[in-house]
């Protein structure tokens, strides 16, 4: 290796042979940054002095190159990495930064690296000067790159005064970061300054929190800060701030009141804190806020009491004053707990002072305290406004008067009632209730005349005509049409007045047209008690003219009952006229009772023919669900009077008019009647008629009844006919179900259903054609006849197997479910019952196969399944007859 030395400008430079090409390039291009950087990269692994020398030479030629300065400073910082801050090399690097800033003072990256490097040396003052110089040298648009490092520096070391001043300068440029300043102040225990900053941002309506906190959350932080640190926050008026929050944030009153009280507690001003708690529970308007304040208040009193008791117990020289102080604190705590319900009631009344129920509850809480009760009632009736009252206002006046009455102050009670009748209630019923309660109080005091006079005052007619429902008039002017007042007036007249005055009251009620059916009934009973029967009947008739159905039902009931009790059958024509008048417009739901009463009258005092006529009319006049019962009564009465045969017409009419459900039962009863009379054929015809509305799947009881009837009174022919009808009805209902399903599908499927419907007739014609072909083929084949003609029992011959073999099977045969098996079982029962007839024939056995053969043969002849229409004639007999 050869070392060459170049002397120039008193600078001796030693370089190796490998450096010669780079040196030559530099000589040729001394002002080329690219060639210097290439040389620096070549010397990257050389000793520090060699690299630094190349950098120094480059910067001497190109002092304005930011790239060379940045790389040089980064290289020098790497060289001191791992060394202690007192190493001389640190000063060399600092000197390099200072020389760089002579040319690069507008480059923020250089200042940032210098500031971070100085911070790592823990030289506080010099670092602060560096950051200050950077802020002065750089334009304000680039200060945002310096401040984070500056703030990180002042927070890293414990220098609160410096940090406060730095933050204040920073917030002038970035006021939105005040929350970070507040956090630092709390960490540095500078709570007074923190409270001031928080108060400032809370008052600033344009402040937007970077952490997403609302103004309300910031306010809560301020309250917590100033209330929990009363000895460290001196610059703010805590009481004024929190009270301002009470006016501003009405949904957090409980928390704010507790914060204010807590401030005075921590300040040692316990009496002032107690005053705050008392003020709070007397002003909050929600149960939630009251609960928060009351719990804190109770806890404060309890802790105060316990601490004082501990102090007295620990002090051996405790005096009587100490014991008195303990007793005072204990009394305060007990008094607070006793007042809890009253205080809560006060909160609810502050929410709505027109809540009548809460006023009543407050009176209950003042039990055994007459003065407080009177004061509460007085305040209540003065506070509650009639149009805003929640509840019944008149109950306050009534209970107030009853309280005086219970304590023997009747005159005061009368004064209260008098005042209560002058209140402008919303409804007339409220005023009427006050008058009625007043009259009842007079009755309890045995002042009957006074009670009657009160009712006379209440019902006095006004000078001009006033409508009851005219809200523009006062309730006092409309009271004369109150039914409640008139009803009580009538009761009082009945009890303490004369017949004439009581009758006048009832007549006046009727004239005003405010009576009810009950008033009419009471009036009639009153007249009857005094033996004015015709007057009573006229009263009933007046009521009937005033009311319509169904309200007039009770009047007619009383009228007719009383009339029949008195006259019975002596005035039959008049009674008939009354019943006809009653039933003329009587609705079906009320007709049954009156028709039965009418019929009973005719039975007992009139003609049987008239009674039957009434029953006949009743069957069509009552409700549909009562028609069945009415027909049963009609039939029973007809049987008693005329005998069973006369009931046939009634049964026939019932079957025609009753709905299906009841018609079935009526048909069965009719058939049983005919059976009793020995008319078996008529009974069978009734069963056949009823069977058309009896689906075998639903009304199995009916078919079982018919079967039992045939077993007792029929023969094989009738049994087979019954089974045929059963299959026919079953097929009919199946067809109806299929039709409904088809209609449903056509509705849902639209065009597809239309296409399917068009294909239906073609398919049916195809089936009919196949059936005709099968019938023609079957006629060409010989069919052996049975040796003997058995009437209605299918027998088996030697040719039976051949018949079954030659029978043409129809693949489109209709299956009627299990009717075939049922048919075979029923046929077996018929054979057992008719053994006398079967003994005349040869040995006969019935099998499913033969039944199938007969079914197929009948199908071949009729072109449809034989079981659908049924037949009692064997197939071979039909063929022979045809031949």
Curated annotation (Swiss-Prot):
GO terms for cellular component: catalytic step 2 spliceosome; nucleus; post-mRNA release spliceosomal complex; precatalytic spliceosome; Prp19 complex; U2-type catalytic step 2 spliceosome. SUPFAM superfamilies: TPR-like. Gene3D superfamilies: Tetratricopeptide repeat domain (1.25.40.10). GO terms for biological process: cardioblast cell fate determination; generation of catalytic spliceosome for first transesterification step; Malpighian tubule morphogenesis; morphogenesis of an epithelium; mRNA splicing, via spliceosome; regulation of alternative mRNA splicing, via spliceosome; RNA splicing. Residues 812-834 have a biased composition (Acidic residues). InterPro entries: HAT, HAT_Syf1-like_N, HAT_Syf1_central, HAT_Syf1_CNRKL1_C, Syf1-like, TPR-like_helical_dom_sf. Disulfide bonds: none annotated. The keyword rRNA-binding does not apply. Subunit of the NTC(Nineteen)/Prp19 complex, which is part of the spliceosome. The complex participates in spliceosome assembly, its remodeling and is required for efficient spliceosome activation. Essential for efficient pre-mRNA splicing. In embryos, efficient pre-mRNA splicing of zygotic transcripts is essential during dynamic cellular processes that require rapid division and/or dramatic changes in gene expression such as blastoderm cellularization, tracheal branching morphogenesis, Malpighian morphogenesis and epidermal development. This is Pre-mRNA-splicing factor syf1 homolog. It comes from Drosophila melanogaster.
């Amino acid at each position: 290796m050869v070392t060459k030395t170049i002397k120039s400008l008193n600078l001796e430079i030693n370089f190796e042979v490998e450096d010669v090409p780079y040196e030559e390039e530099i000589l040729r291009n001394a002002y080329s940054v690219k060639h210097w950087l290439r040389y620096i990269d070549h010397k990257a692994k050389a000793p520090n002095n060699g690299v630094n020398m190349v950098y120094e030479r480059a910067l001497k030629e190109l002092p304005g190159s930011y790239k060379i300065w940045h790389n040089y400073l980064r290289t020098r910082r790497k060289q001191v990495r791992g060394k202690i801050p007192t190493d001389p090399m640190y000063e060399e690097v600092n000197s390099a930064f200072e020389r760089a800033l002579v040319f690069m003072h507008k480059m923020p990256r250089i200042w940032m690296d210098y500031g971070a490097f100085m911070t790592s040396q823990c030289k506080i003052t010099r670092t602060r000067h560096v950051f200050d110089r950077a802020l002065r040298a750089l334009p304000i648009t680039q200060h945002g790159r310096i401040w984070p490092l500056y703030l990180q520096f002042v927070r890293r070391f414990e220098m609160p005064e410096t940090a406060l001043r730095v933050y204040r300068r920073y917030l002038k440029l970035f006021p939105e970061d005040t929350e970070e300043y507040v956090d630092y102040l709390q960490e540095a225990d500078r709570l007074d300054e923190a409270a001031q900053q928080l108060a400032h941002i809370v008052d600033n309506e344009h402040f937007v929190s970077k952490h997403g906190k609302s103004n309300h959350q910031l306010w809560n932080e301020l309250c917590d800060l100033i209330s929990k640190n009363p000895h460290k926050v001196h610059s703010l008026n805590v009481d004024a701030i929190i009270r301002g929050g009470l006016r501003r944030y009405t949904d957090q009153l409980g928390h704010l009141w507790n914060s204010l009280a807590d401030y005075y507690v921590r300040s040692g001003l316990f009496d002032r804190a107690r005053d705050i708690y008392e003020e709070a529970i007397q002003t909050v308007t929600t149960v939630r806020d009251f609960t928060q304040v009351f719990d804190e208040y109770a806890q404060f009193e309890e802790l105060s009491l316990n601490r004082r008791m501990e102090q007295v117990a620990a002090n051996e020289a405790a005096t009587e004053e100490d014991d008195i102080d303990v007793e005072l604190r204990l009394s305060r705590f007990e008094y607070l707990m006793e007042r809890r319900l009253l205080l809560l009631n006060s909160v609810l009344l502050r929410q709505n002072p027109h809540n009548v129920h809460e006023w009543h509850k407050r009176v209950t809480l003042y039990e055994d305290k007459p003065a407080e009760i009177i004061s509460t009632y007085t305040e209540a009736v003065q506070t509650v406004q009639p149009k805003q009252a929640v509840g019944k206002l008149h109950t306050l006046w009534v209970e107030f008067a009853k309280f005086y009455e219970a304590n023997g102050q009747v005159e005061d009670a009368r004064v209260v009632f008098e005042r209560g009748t002058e209140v402008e209630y919303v409804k007339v019923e409220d005023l009427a209730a006050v008058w009625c309660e007043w009259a009842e109080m007079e009755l309890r005091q045995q002042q009957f005349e006074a009670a009657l006079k009160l009712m006379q005052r209440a019902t006095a007619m006004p000078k001009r005509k006033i409508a009851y429902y005219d809200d523009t008039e006062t309730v006092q002017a409309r009271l004369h049409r109150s039914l409640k007042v008139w009803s009580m007036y009538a009761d009082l007249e009945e009890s303490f007045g004369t017949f004439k005055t009581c009758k006048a009251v009832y007549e006046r009620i009727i004239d005003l047209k405010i009576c009810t059916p009950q008033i009419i009934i009471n009036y009639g009973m009153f007249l009857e008690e005094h033996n004015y029967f015709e007057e009573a009947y006229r009263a009933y008739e007046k009521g009937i003219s005033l009311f319509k159905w169904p309200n007039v039902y009770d009047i007619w009931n009383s009228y007719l009952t009383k009339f029949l009790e008195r006259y019975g059958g002596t005035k039959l024509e008049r009674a008939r006229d009354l019943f006809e008048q009653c039933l003329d417009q009587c609705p079906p739901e009320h007709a049954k009772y009156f028709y039965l009463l009418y019929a009973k009258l005719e039975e007992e005092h009139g003609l049987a023919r008239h009674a039957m006529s009434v029953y006949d009319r009743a069957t069509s006049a009552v409700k549909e669900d009562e028609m069945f019962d009415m027909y049963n009564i009609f039939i029973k009465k007809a049987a008693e009077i005329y005998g069973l045969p006369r009931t046939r017409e009634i049964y026939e009419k019932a079957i025609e008019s009753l709905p299906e459900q009841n018609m079935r039962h009526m048909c069965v009863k009719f058939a049983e009647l005919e059976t009793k009379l020995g008319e078996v054929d008529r009974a069978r015809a009734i069963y056949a008629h009823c069977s058309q509305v009896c689906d075998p799947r639903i009304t199995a009881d009916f078919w079982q009844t018919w079967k039992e009837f045939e077993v007792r009174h029929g023969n094989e022919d009738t049994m087979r006919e019954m089974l045929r009808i059963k299959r026919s009805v079953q097929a009919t209902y199946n067809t109806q179900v299929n039709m409904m399903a088809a209609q449903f599908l056509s509705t849902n499927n639209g065009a597809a259903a239309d296409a399917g419907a068009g294909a239906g007739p073609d398919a049916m014609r195809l089936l009919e054609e196949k059936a005709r072909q099968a019938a023609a083929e079957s006629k060409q084949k010989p069919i052996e006849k049975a040796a003997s003609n058995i009437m209605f029992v299918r027998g088996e011959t030697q040719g039976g197997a051949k018949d079954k073999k030659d029978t043409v099977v129809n693949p489109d045969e209709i299956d009627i479910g299990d009717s075939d098996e049922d048919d075979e079982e029923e046929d077996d029962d018929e054979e057992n019952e008719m053994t006398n007839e079967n003994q005349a024939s040869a040995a006969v056995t019935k099998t499913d196969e033969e039944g199938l053969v007969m079914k197929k043969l009948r199908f071949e002849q009729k072109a449809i399944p034989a079981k659908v229409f049924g037949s009692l004639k064997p197939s071979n007999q039909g063929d022979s007859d045809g031949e």
